[in-house]
């Protein structure tokens, strides 16, 4: 009896850390050196920052992020302790931009949505690092990603991640789904992008775009 108890206890000690390990799923560049050089031609270096909502502001910050997103965080990809990886990119001593990615639930599996931003939070590039989808070819097409260029969080505040609709002027309206059957993954990409931009605004830009959330709220009244 005692032997069974000891075996059970040891197994619990082994399994528990594994559960904790997989409870928070981060999103890193597959090859930072190569990817940063490709996304920022002429850059000379980068700094990697790891930030989590529970460390930065805890439950209060999570609530604020969810309000800005217009949806609740859920699943392994959106726990309060997810370690977000933010890349600050430099040319010499000058900072020239940021790269940040998030995990997002797709129809057939996880999606990794990355945005490349200038210092003002304007999207300079968009791409999927991981995309498990029957329509991956169409969604990975360069023309699809180009539709995000020039947009900011201000545009995405007018996009409702729950309904998939925009209200008021928004550059998100110009982003077209290349395949009607890919609607789930298309909307997942937009939700992931909005979440991405909100986290960068919270962690790096000092809530520069928070003022526009209030404007959108007033428009809906």
Show which residues each predicted segment covers.
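Intrinsically disordered terminal and processing segments
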Residues: 8, 17-112, 119-221
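Sec-dependent N-terminal signal peptides
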Residues: 6-12
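Positively charged n-region of N-terminal signal peptides that target proteins for export
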Residues: 1-5
């Amino acid at each position: 009896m005692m032997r069974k108890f000891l075996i059970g206890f040891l197994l619990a000690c082994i399994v528990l850390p594994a559960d904790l390990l997989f409870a928070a799923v981060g999103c890193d560049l597959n090859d930072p050196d190569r990817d940063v050089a490709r996304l920022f031609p002429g850059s000379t270096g980068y700094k990697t920052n790891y930030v989590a909502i529970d460390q930065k502001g805890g439950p209060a910050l999570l609530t604020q992020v969810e309000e800005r997103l217009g949806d609740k965080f859920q699943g392994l990809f959106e726990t309060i302790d997810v370690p977000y990886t933010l890349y600050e990119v430099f040319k010499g001593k000058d900072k020239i931009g940021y790269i940040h990615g998030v995990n997002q639930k797709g129809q057939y599996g996880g999606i990794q949505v990355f945005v490349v931003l200038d210092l003002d939070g304007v999207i300079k590039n968009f791409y999927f690092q991981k995309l498990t989808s029957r329509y991956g070819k169409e969604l990975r097409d360069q023309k699809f990603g180009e539709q995000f260029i020039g947009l900011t969080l201000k545009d995405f505040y007018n996009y409702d991640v729950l309904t998939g609709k925009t209200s008021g002027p928004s550059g998100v309206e110009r982003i077209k789904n290349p395949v009607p059957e890919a609607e789930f993954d298309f909307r997942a990409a937009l939700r992931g992008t909005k979440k991405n931009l909100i986290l960068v605004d919270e962690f790096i830009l000092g809530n520069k775009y928070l003022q526009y959330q209030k404007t959108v709220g007033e428009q809906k009244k």
